[in-house]
């Protein structure tokens, strides 16, 4: 399935584990595309390109996916190289320098036009790559309040949330939010951030 950009707003994004055109990448893709579950040995036999350890989509959440499925993390993989950008990761994947990369779920949609013209791919990006896994939701920026503050009553929190949401409903408000690259807010539940809590707990181990 090809990823496409839409005008729909969302409160989260995801990360993907993406196999490329190398022999190992295609071997892993073939297993997934025929409904077979990848083993840890399968994944550990590949060369991975990842981002820095503080990157949510380029390291933390793919590592959490590995932890939840295999009890392992990116740091346990035998062959890992760090990229300085997602452009570099995609270039390495297209050139067959690495077998697998990790990053935000719309990587292919963003870089597909450059796959052959700049990155060295020999066929269409979507034909030469395959999604091996999709991570938990990575929540976008959030406005939080303290649980320990005396003034944070349920009524105040509701009024504060309403005020923040209303900012995004006017043109003047959107101009203010543009400084943060935000285009609006939605109500959230504490449970929306369970995956983030799991990620933070994993990082402590």
Each predicted region: which residue ranges?
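A ligand-binding cleft/hinge motif common to bilobed small-molecule-binding domains
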Residues: 67-68, 92-95, 99-126
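An extracytoplasmic/periplasmic, membrane-proximal ligand-sensing/linker region
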Residues: 151-205
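A conserved helix-loop-strand patch within extracytoplasmic ligand-binding domains
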Residues: 2-56, 64
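Short helix-initiation/N-cap motifs at beta->coil->alpha
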Residues: 73-91, 137
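Extracytoplasmic/secreted proteins, especially bacterial periplasmic and envelope-associated proteins
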Residues: 61, 65, 88, 92, ...
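Periplasmic-binding protein-like
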Residues: 1-16, 118-161, 180-184
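Second-shell loop/turn segments in exported
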Residues: 47-56, 79, 147-150, 182-187
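Solvent-exposed loop/turn segments at secondary-structure junctions
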Residues: 5-6, 23-25, 53-57, 87, ...
């Amino acid at each position: 399935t090809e990823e496409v950009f839409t005008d729909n707003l969302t409160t989260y994004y995801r990360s993907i584990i993406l196999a490329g055109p190398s022999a190992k990448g295609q071997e892993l893709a073939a297993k997934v595309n025929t409904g077979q579950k990848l083993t840890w040995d399968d994944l550990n036999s590949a060369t991975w390109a990842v981002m820095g350890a503080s990157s949510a989509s380029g390291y933390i959440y793919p590592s959490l996916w590995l932890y939840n499925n295999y009890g392992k993390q990116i740091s346990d993989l035998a062959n890992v190289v760090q990229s300085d950008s997602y452009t570099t990761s995609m270039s390495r994947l297209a050139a067959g320098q690495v077998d697998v990369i990790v990053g935000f779920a719309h990587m292919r949609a963003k870089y597909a036009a450059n796959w052959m013209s700049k990155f060295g791919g020999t066929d269409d990006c979507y034909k030469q790559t395959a999604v091996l896994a999709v991570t938990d939701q990575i929540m976008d920026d959030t406005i939080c309040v303290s649980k320990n503050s005396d003034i944070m009553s349920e009524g105040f929190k509701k009024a504060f949330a309403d005020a923040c949401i209303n900012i995004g409903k006017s043109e003047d408000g959107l101009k203010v939010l543009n400084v943060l690259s935000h285009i609006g807010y939605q109500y959230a539940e504490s449970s929306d951030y369970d995956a983030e809590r799991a990620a933070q707990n994993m990082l402590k181990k």
